[in-house]
A protein has these predicted regions:
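ATP-dependent adenylation/pyrophosphate-handling site
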Residues: 11, 124-130, 134-171
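Alpha-helix capping and helix-loop boundary segments enriched in small/acidic/polar residues
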Residues: 21, 25, 50, 101, ...
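Catalytic-loop motifs flanking and including active-site residues across diverse enzymes
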Residues: 106, 139, 212-215
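Enzyme catalytic cores with a strong preference for nitrogen-chemistry domains
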Residues: 1-129, 145, 149, 181
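A conserved beta-strand->alpha-helix junction
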Residues: 76-83, 151-156, 160-201, 209
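Short acidic, glycine/serine/threonine-rich loops at helix termini
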Residues: 21-24, 53-56, 137-142, 156, ...
């Protein structure tokens, strides 16, 4: 029906949350719609974190032949201008922001979600355990990118099984991202529990994690 109206532009406003690979799906859908209505399509998308959702922005314009005419950056607010020539058969290509690579895209989505969640809930900092492993290193880097290293509080909680290498890596990480750093050995607490409970196997391993959780919550 819109194709019969001879419209100049189809405008669609969206609050479409981020999913990996979704930008290509949106573009494919917009290309089909622009061809159906025989008019360029402007796809506007919300940007920012809201609770457990992240909106990635990346608004764009496509022509009737599927040409990408304009694209805003992902994961940031942006003001851009696109000139629509209603007398032209096809539009001129404007500014097209580069797409991040897949790993950078997911990382940036996590950082934006954390940053906006903290801001909207008036949280002042991030407190987390630093084991010296890749898991906590990645989360700490995200936190530093979201709120600044000076607002990140890293806690090393070594046990009798922790290697010197792991301890050194945790300290190096905190220094590299500019985070606060403290050491809280869990061996005395672990020994106290074991003297009473005499746990073995998985139960003993889980005890270390529970002790570390209590320490992080206490700091938080």
């Amino acid at each position: 029906e819109l194709a019969k109206e001879n419209i100049d532009l189809l405008l669609t406003m969206n609050g479409s949350p981020y999913e990996e690979g979704k930008t290509d799906t949106r573009l494919d859908l917009a290309v089909r719609r622009a061809a159906e209505v025989n008019a360029p399509m402007l796809y506007l998308n919300q940007v920012g974190g809201q609770d457990d959702l992240v909106f990635d922005g990346g608004s764009f314009v496509v022509d009737t032949d599927g040409t990408l005419l304009e694209r805003s950056p992902m994961f940031m607010e942006d003001l851009s201008f696109f000139d629509l020539d209603t007398s032209a058969e096809h539009q001129k290509v404007g500014t097209i922001a580069a797409k991040p690579d897949p790993d950078e895209e997911v990382y940036t989505a996590c950082v934006l979600g954390l940053k906006d969640y903290m801001a909207k809930n008036h949280f002042k900092g991030v407190c987390l355990g630093l084991s010296g492993g890749i898991d906590s290193a990645l989360v700490a880097a995200m936190a530093a990118d979201a709120v600044g290293g000076e607002n990140v509080y890293g806690i090393s909680m070594p046990s009798m099984y922790s290697s010197d290498g792991s301890k050194d890596d945790a300290a190096d990480l905190a220094r590299n991202i500019g985070a606060h750093y403290d050491i809280q050995p869990i061996e005395p607490l672990f020994v106290s529990f074991q003297n009473q409970l005499e746990l073995e196997g998985v139960a003993a391993e889980n005890l270390q994690a529970r002790i570390r959780g209590v320490i992080v919550m206490a700091y938080s």
